[in-house]
């Protein structure tokens, strides 16, 4: 058995009245059966973040580091690549055309 913070992870059968997370639902093992703690509920789905709503965000594409002493044109190209990666990942709002 190993412990992850306060959660115990084990391939063995649970102890009587131990609280476990099972398939996203909190349960305890009592008299040989799993008992659900709390009511039945739908799983939570994290919404996408928008300019007005907090939510999950996607990971942006990697943009490599600039070389030391890079020319201004190279810096401008790299900054534009970063902005593009943020927009493609829906982290930044697209330009209005």
UniProtKB/Swiss-Prot annotation:
Record bears the keyword Methyltransferase: no
GO annotation, cellular component aspect: virion component
Protein name: Head fiber trimeric protein
Location of this chain's protein in the cell: Virion
GO biological process, one term: virion attachment to host cell
Bridged cysteine pairs (disulfide): none
Subunit annotation: Homotrimer. Interacts with the major capsid protein.
Annotated function: Forms short fibers at the surface of the viral capsid.
InterPro entries per record: Phage_B103_Gp8
């Amino acid at each position: 058995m190993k412990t992850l913070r306060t959660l115990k992870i084990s391939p063995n059968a649970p102890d009587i009245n131990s609280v476990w997370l099972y398939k996203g639902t909190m349960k305890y093992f009592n008299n040989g059966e799993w008992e659900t703690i709390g009511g039945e509920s739908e799983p939570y789905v994290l919404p996408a973040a928008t300019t007005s709503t907090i939510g999950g965000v996607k990971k942006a594409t990697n943009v490599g580091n600039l070389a030391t002493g890079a020319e201004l044109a190279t810096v401008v190209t790299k900054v534009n690549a970063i902005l593009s990666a943020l927009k493609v990942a829906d982290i930044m709002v697209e330009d209005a055309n």
